[in-house]
């Protein structure tokens, strides 16, 4: 537990400018305003701190786009800084006193009065890079979808043969179609431009996928997540990149809520209306949480129902559907269960049995093929069977051999 500082600084920051309100808290029962500084350039923030702020201080920063980078800059200069949620001062704003310096003042007073019960967690430099890779993959996929829709729209509008859904062969097939149908003029120029952009994004997505796969290969915790049915290496990477430290979640349900799998419950008043606005009517989730984790684990839930129906989790899902439950709700419920299992894996809890060992080995062989035999040999690995056996030994090596009666069917 750190000692309380003498000075408390509230900071309201924007993309280029920031304002700080400095409070002297040497008298714990009577904090007083020390100084206010407005319209500070972010580039000159450290120099301003060195001239005006005592090292025995804490800076309270409202959560925003650049708050994590500001915290790192202050920490590197020797100042303590913490990030708080943006709603900390929501009830303290006044219609006639809304400005940056008042927000900075309210942040400092919120800390002094004990209204801040926790700080926002910020990732390490390594995991910040992992998140950047995940965001780059997400943005590339979005741009590919937009371009694919534009190509489809143009072909439909002009009466050309509609492209296939397979991204890998789409460009080559459409270029052959341009030659065969003798498309000319501006339509040809526009279509070729769209295909060129789509091909560039496809190559970028392939490079990012390979990079993610190699990161997962070098991270034992991410590899252990692959023992879950329906979870591919991108889902394992997205979850671990978002979590980093699983011990900040005291229970599995808190990790599930963080991953976006907090169900809408029957409530009243503003809470219910807010949940409906975020999640939509008749949707199973409340719309909060990390969308990247939610996407991959919802996809994992669909995979369990379609390809892993003979597993224990798949049988449970189909039992719920046969009882009349909505398929979407069952998919979300399976995704939530997978996140619950992930919480135990990330914390290092031992695998309970060998029921999924053969499934894990098959998954490791597929993962080996994803990276490619040539690259795996360059990284120092043997054949795919040797790789699968070695990884399975790390996960299941200390467990007793399963008997035929107790072994779970894992046809996935």
Language-model regions, residue ranges each:
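Glycine-rich, often acidic, oxyanion-interacting loops/wings at catalytic, nucleic-acid
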Residues: 138-224
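Nucleic-acid-processing active sites and adjacent nucleic-acid-binding tracks
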Residues: 27-56
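A short, charged helix-loop
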Residues: 108-132, 173-183
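Short alpha-helix plus adjacent loop in nuclease-associated cores
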Residues: 82-122, 272-288
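Gly/Thr-rich phosphate-binding beta-strand-loop-beta motif of the actin/hexokinase/Hsp70
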Residues: 2-25, 107, 238
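Phosphate-backbone recognition surface of nucleic-acid-processing proteins
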Residues: 224-227, 233, 238-323, 327, ...
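Low-complexity, acidic/Ser/Thr- and charged residue-rich accessory regions of DNA metabolism proteins
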Residues: 317-335, 339-412
């Amino acid at each position: 537990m750190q000692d309380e500082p003498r000075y408390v600084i509230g900071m309201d920051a924007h993309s280029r400018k920031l304002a700080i309100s400095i409070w002297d808290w040497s008298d714990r029962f009577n904090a007083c305003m020390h100084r206010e500084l407005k319209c500070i350039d972010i580039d000159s923030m450290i120099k301003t701190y060195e001239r005006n702020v005592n090292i025995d201080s804490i800076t309270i920063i409202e959560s925003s786009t650049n708050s994590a980078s500001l915290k790192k800059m202050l920490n590197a200069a020797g100042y303590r800084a913490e990030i708080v949620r943006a709603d900390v001062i929501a009830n303290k704003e006044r219609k006639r006193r809304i400005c940056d310096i008042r927000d900075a003042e309210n942040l400092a007073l919120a800390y002094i009065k004990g209204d801040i019960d926790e700080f926002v967690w910020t990732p390490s430099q390594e995991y910040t890079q992992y998140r950047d890779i995940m965001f780059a993959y997400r943005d590339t996929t979005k741009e590919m979808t937009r371009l694919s829709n534009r190509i489809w729209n143009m072909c439909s509008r002009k009466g050309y043969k509609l492209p296939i859904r397979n991204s890998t062969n789409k460009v080559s097939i459409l270029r052959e179609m341009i030659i065969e149908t003798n498309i000319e003029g501006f339509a040809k120029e526009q279509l070729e431009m769209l295909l060129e952009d789509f091909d560039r994004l496809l190559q970028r997505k392939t490079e990012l996928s390979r990079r993610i796969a190699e990161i997962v290969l070098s991270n034992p915790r991410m590899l252990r997540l692959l023992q879950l049915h329906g979870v591919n290496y991108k889902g394992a990477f997205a979850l671990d990149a978002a979590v980093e430290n699983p011990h900040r979640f005291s229970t599995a349900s808190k990790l599930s809520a963080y991953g976006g799998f907090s169900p809408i419950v029957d409530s009243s008043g503003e809470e219910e209306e807010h949940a409906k606005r975020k999640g939509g009517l008749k949707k199973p989730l409340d719309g909060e949480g990390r969308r990247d984790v939610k996407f991959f684990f919802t996809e994992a839930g669909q995979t369990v129902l379609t390809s892993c129906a003979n597993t224990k989790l798949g049988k449970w899902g189909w039992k719920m559907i046969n009882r009349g439950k909505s398929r979407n709700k069952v998919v979300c419920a399976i995704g939530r269960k997978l996140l619950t299992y992930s919480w135990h894996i990330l914390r290092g809890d031992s695998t309970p049995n060998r029921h999924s060992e053969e499934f894990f080995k098959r998954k490791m062989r597929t993962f080996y093929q994803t990276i490619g035999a040539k690259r795996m040999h360059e990284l120092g690995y043997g054949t795919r069977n040797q790789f699968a056996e070695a990884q399975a030994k790390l996960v299941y090596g200390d467990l007793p051999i399963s008997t035929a009666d107790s072994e779970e069917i894992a046809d996935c």
